[in-house]
């Protein structure tokens, strides 16, 4: 099997082949010179400096001015470079010839037959031939293998492995399930209060904490950059501190795995450390039968803020489902099933979320079934949200203090550390600070004071019971489609979105009192989440609004909706969550809120007037945008291209804007002159003697040498000089 050597990114295209060095049949080593290429570039040079430049000028400079000093001139210079072989092997054929122009990257230069493609490399050595392999020796981009940073495979091998995996899964009638850990299937905290309550039978939370597991890990020390003695030797590091983690498994997890495991091959993907992930895996999968070693952690992910299925399945994600409590870290990919976050240790949050983008507090913190809770519980919920906010403020304050120290160390360090970026150090500081703040502030103990002898921790979550049904339905849909004859191959990246979109189809939402003020609602998680299920959300009520979502029926928007359009359903947020977990639009009646005092007739009239003005403004704006789009899409070549060859150099009027007509007119004229210069060059090339005519195997260049725009007569002189230089170069 032959390997194509292609023109790489980063060369100063277009380039011209000047010489082919090895002949067909020659054996190439990695790094051997394949060919010589040349390219041209423009330089601006003052001709009165008298300096002796060793570089070859293709043409002489311009004429001197009246005062004896020549103005700066543009000169075309030629440069020659070598192109080296990235691979080892026998040269089978050349796909370019001397004189050919290569216009862009990724054009085939030649083909070789390699003794080994080095498809699998471990620790820098090929597992097939034993040779040391550089990154350039891969056929394509080297891909990291999950769980082992030393193992890499080529794109060719990844495709082969992907096909084999698909065949294996289909033979077993399985799909792939990627599982997040924190707040998806478990909740973890480091508050020492948990251990105290767990060991106190008289504590009201004792029974709820019976099945809480615990483990300990060494805290990762974030040492100062200058942590060394005066003689340059490292200081003795401080003693390692142990941190106790307390883990609550989401209710129904055992039944969930029993239902899902026969249908899915499961993988763990977490933004926690590998040590943490392995400990959690021991708790949720003590025998290792469910996940095995299929664990991807922050240590192997390559990103501190995002997750990507390409890390696990680089060539094909058509059989993959993801479950995670965060949609933003996945960029809301089509494979994602977002779950309601599991919040057992109230007020603690996700201890590993410091490595992820910050989330705004709001509706998602409420969770489900909040309408069934007592007034006292509602007050507690408010306290929980306030407590989380205060904890985050303390974390931010501590991180800021540490960052100032870090910035000072970076500023005074002669050489910054190469092993870690500032971003990585900052994230570690945030993580360390979050653990320390939770341990010292004991948020659970503070919240328990509100309830006295009543239990704070309630274990009534039922998310996984609904989720197992959803996953079973997706599995059935996939294999039903696969069994149909003459149908396109099923793809979960299409199946999952199509099932979701039916839930809130033709629903138009307005949220009241649930999204923090000043937030762009289109960037809010709940708005993005519901949009993946087919809903459209707007900040204000209009003629299309079908649902107003609020906890409080006395808000202005709720009162307005009641008066403006009685058909608008005013519902509690629990209705949204019930639809999301069931993947179907449930009846609104049990969640409908009663509005006792709608707005007055006068207020309604004022609103309708403002709404009418808003509608007129939107229509006017859309009309203007439509007109601009129509102008931009004018087909300038509908009547032919003869107008491009106008020898009188007439200016082309600008149709896009009347306000800046003069400026745009000048710019257009300059661009036309540049294009004409390039067209003349091509015309000269086309009429050149047959013996020296260029044969271009790759795409023709659309860009000539870059010319900086001058002013007035200087610009015309420069254009004339450039044309003379190009003609002299071609004559040579």
UniProtKB/Swiss-Prot annotation:
Ranges of biased composition (kind: Acidic residues): 646-674, 713-732
SUPFAM superfamilies, sorted: BRCT domain, HAD-like
Protein name from the UniProt record: RNA polymerase II subunit A C-terminal domain phosphatase
Ranges of residues in domain BRCT: 499-593
Residues where Phosphoserine is found: 701, 718, 720
Organism: Saccharomyces cerevisiae (strain ATCC 204508 / S288c)
Ranges where the record places region Disordered: 50-73, 642-732
Domain FCP1 homology: 170-363
């Amino acid at each position: 099997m032959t390997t194509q050597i292609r023109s790489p990114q980063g060369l100063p295209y277009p380039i011209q082949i000047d010489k082919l060095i090895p002949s067909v049949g020659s054996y190439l080593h990695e790094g051997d010179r394949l060919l010589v290429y040349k390219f041209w570039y423009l330089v601006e040079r003052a001709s009165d400096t008298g300096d002796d430049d060793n570089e070859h000028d293709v043409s002489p400079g311009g004429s001197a001015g009246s005062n004896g000093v020549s103005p700066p001139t543009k000169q075309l210079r030629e440069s020659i470079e070598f192109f080296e072989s990235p691979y080892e092997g026998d040269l089978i054929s050349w796909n370019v010839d001397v004189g050919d122009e290569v216009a862009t990257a990724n054009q085939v230069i030649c083909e070789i037959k390699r003794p080994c493609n080095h498809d699998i490399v471990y620790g820098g050595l090929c597992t097939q031939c034993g040779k040391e392999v550089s990154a350039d020796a891969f056929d394509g981009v080297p891909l990291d293998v999950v769980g082992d940073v030393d193992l890499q495979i080529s794109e060719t091998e990844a495709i082969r492995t992907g096909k084999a995996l698909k065949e294996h899964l289909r033979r077993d009638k399985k799909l792939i399930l990627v599982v997040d850990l924190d707040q998806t299937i478990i909740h973890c905290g480091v508050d020492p209060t948990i251990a105290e309550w767990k060991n106190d039978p008289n504590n009201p939370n004792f029974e709820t904490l019976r099945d809480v597991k615990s483990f300990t890990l060494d805290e990762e020390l974030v040492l100062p950059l200058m942590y060394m003695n005066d003689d340059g030797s490292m200081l003795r590091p401080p003693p390692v501190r142990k941190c106790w983690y307390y883990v609550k498994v989401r209710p129904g997890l055992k039944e969930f795995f029993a239902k899902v495991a026969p249908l899915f091959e499961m993988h763990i993907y977490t933004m926690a450390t590998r040590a943490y992930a392995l400990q959690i895996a021991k708790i949720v999968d003590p025998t290792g039968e469910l996940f095995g070693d299929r664990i991807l952690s922050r240590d192997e992910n390559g990103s501190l803020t995002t997750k990507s299925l390409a890390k696990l399945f680089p060539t094909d994600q058509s059989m993959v489902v993801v479950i995670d409590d965060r949609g933003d870290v996945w960029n809301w990919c089509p494979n994602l099933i977002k779950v309601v976050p599991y919040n057992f240790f109230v007020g603690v949050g996700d201890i590993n979320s410091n490595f992820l983008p910050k989330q705004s507090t709001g509706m998602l913190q409420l969770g489900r079934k909040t309408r069934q809770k007592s007034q006292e519980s509602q007050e507690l919920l408010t306290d929980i949200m306030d407590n989380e906010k205060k904890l985050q403020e303390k974390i931010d304050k501590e991180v800021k203090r540490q960052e100032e120290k870090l910035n000072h160390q970076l500023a005074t360090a002669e050489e910054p550390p190469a092993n870690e970026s500032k971003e990585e150090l900052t994230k570690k500081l945030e993580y360390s600070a979050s653990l320390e703040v939770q341990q010292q502030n004991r948020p659970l103990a503070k919240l328990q004071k509100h309830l006295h002898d009543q239990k704070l921790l309630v274990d009534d979550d039922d998310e996984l019971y609904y989720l197992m049904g959803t996953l079973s339905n997706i599995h059935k849909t996939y294999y039903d489609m696969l069994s149909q004859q003459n149908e396109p191959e099923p793809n979960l990246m299409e199946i999952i979105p199509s099932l979701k979109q039916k839930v809130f189809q033709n629903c138009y939402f307005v949220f009241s009192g649930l999204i923090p003020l000043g937030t762009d609602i289109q960037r809010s998680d709940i708005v993005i989440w519901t949009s993946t299920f087919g809903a459209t959300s707007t900040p204000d009520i209009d003629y299309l609004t079908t649902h107003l979502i609020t906890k409080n029926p006395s808000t202005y928007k709720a009162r307005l909706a009641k008066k403006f359009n009685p058909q608008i359903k005013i519902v509690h947020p629990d209705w949204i969550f019930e639809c999301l977990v069931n993947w179907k639009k449930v009846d609104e009646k049990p969640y409908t809120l009663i509005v006792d005092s709608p707005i007055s007739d006068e207020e309604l009239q004022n609103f309708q007037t403002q709404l009418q003005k808003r509608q007129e403004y939107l229509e006017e704006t859309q009309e203007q945008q439509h007109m601009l789009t129509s102008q931009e899409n004018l087909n300038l070549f509908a009547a032919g291209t003869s107008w491009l060859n106008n020898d009188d150099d007439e200016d082309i009027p600008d149709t896009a804007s009347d306000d800046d007509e003069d400026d745009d007119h000048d710019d257009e004229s300059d661009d036309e002159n540049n294009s004409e210069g390039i067209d003349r060059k091509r015309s000269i090339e086309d009429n050149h003697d047959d013996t020296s005519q260029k044969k271009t195997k790759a795409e023709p260049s659309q860009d000539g040498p870059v010319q900086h725009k001058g002013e007035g007569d200087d610009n015309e002189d420069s254009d004339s000089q450039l044309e003379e230089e190009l003609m002299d170069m071609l004559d040579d």
